[in-house]
């Protein structure tokens, strides 16, 4: 249980990677059938998740915000942790303490330079 928490909450400690033939591998999930199996993660740390999430932030989400649009992001918990870490500039050493409640929208008000002016949960 302690080791699982370390894998789930640390920034740069990944869990053991799945073998490609493992039945839990994402290559066997229908929703990924149109994605090159070589790019599907077999497990990842939050650091690795950031490497996947931040290009999407920069290429898809940030431009919409700069156009003045409101953007709703619904994602897996670790993807949200990666995005919140980036937006709030949370140091790696503090990331194990970041709690993101399930099903509770978090609002980010952004400045023109895309820094966070304020954030809060709708409750």
Which residues does each predicted region cover?
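Acidic, low-complexity terminal tails and accessory targeting/binding regions
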Residues: 3, 17-20, 42, 46-47, ...
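Short glycine/proline- and acidic residue-enriched helix-loop micro-motifs
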Residues: 3-48
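Short, well-ordered beta-to-alpha junction loops that form the rim of enzyme active sites
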Residues: 9-12, 68-70, 74-78
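Short alpha-helical linear motifs
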Residues: 31-33, 73, 99
